[in-house]
Amino acid sequence: MIDFGNFYSLIAKNHLSHWLETLPAQIANWQREQQHGLFKQWSNAVEFLPEIKPYHLDLLHSVTAESEEPLSAGQIKRIETLMRNLMPWRKGPFSLYGVNIDTEWRSDWKWDRVLPHLSDLTGRTILDVGCGSGYHMWRMIGAGAHLAVGIDPTQLFLCQFEAVRKLLGNDQRAHLLPLGIEQLPALKAFDTVFSMGVLYHRRSPLEHLWQLKDQLVNEGELVLETLVIDGDENTVLVPGDRYAQMRNVYFIPSALALKNWLKKCGFVDIRIADVSVTTTEEQRRTEWMVTESLADFLDPHDPGKTVEGYPAPKRAVLIARKP
């Protein structure tokens, strides 16, 4: 059973304590009524993992844990088998005691694009919206963050996160809650808020930007990463039934239009930090994610287009400040 008591105890002592007015009841409701049919199977995989305290832990350059003495072949096989029970692994990679989880996404490449543009994360309390398996939260901790809180309603991601946490010595500097941002009160408590790979899935993107703003302290920093298309400040793509085989893609603005959206929501010091085409080296099928990936979603005769004929995925990073 995944227990959130440590997180409650942690925030009871800090500026997030007012969250306890609503959070425990929400989590209790989720535990009672909303668990996925496979959740027990996934949580069992976490439970059966060994508790290991890493002798060497690198969260600055990667997510890598090593023991003082190499694990036996049997121990490594046990860890690998249990982690494979949590497939598909989409966000990573992770290197854990000789088990190398080669995830669909090279999330480390995204982090390398984002990190140089951020305010120093040292000592910061961070919210990561749509955090997936929590890979980037561990990198935030590696960059000096005091506390990283992730929210993502996908329950497999929660179990993946808890599995990695257990293999990192039950590290309590990062926590994942199975919630969507619409379930959070306006906490106004985070120094930095990340929303990466979420905006295009929202039916109301401006509402999402307001929700992000409501989580920031005054002078806090927003890090927004999302799909964009080429064009001027008035260019927005509204895909038909699917975009790159995804049904739940609603709005893809140009980077300049997105800058205007942020301005309209009251953000200042808005800058476009990076624009990059997503490659089939960064997102691809692996033995830890064996179903279709980006190469299957692009036009086989023109990789500059999706199978539906839209521009192929391009992602921008924008940084903004809440005044």
Swiss-Prot record:
Residues reported to bind carboxy-S-adenosyl-L-methionine: K91, W105, K110, G130, D152, P153, T154, I181, E182, M196, Y200, R315
EC numbers: 2.5.1.-
Transmembrane parts of this sequence: none
InterPro entries: CmoB (IPR010017), Mo5U34_MeTrfas-like (IPR027555), SAM-dependent_MTases_sf (IPR029063)
Summary of subunit composition and partner proteins: Homotetramer.
NCBIfam families membership: PRK15068.1, tRNA 5-methoxyuridine(34)/uridine 5-oxyacetic acid(34) synthase CmoB
Record-given protein name: tRNA U34 carboxymethyltransferase
Organism of provenance: Escherichia coli O81 (strain ED1a)
Species classification: Bacteria, Pseudomonadati, Pseudomonadota, Gammaproteobacteria, Enterobacterales
Gene field: cmoB
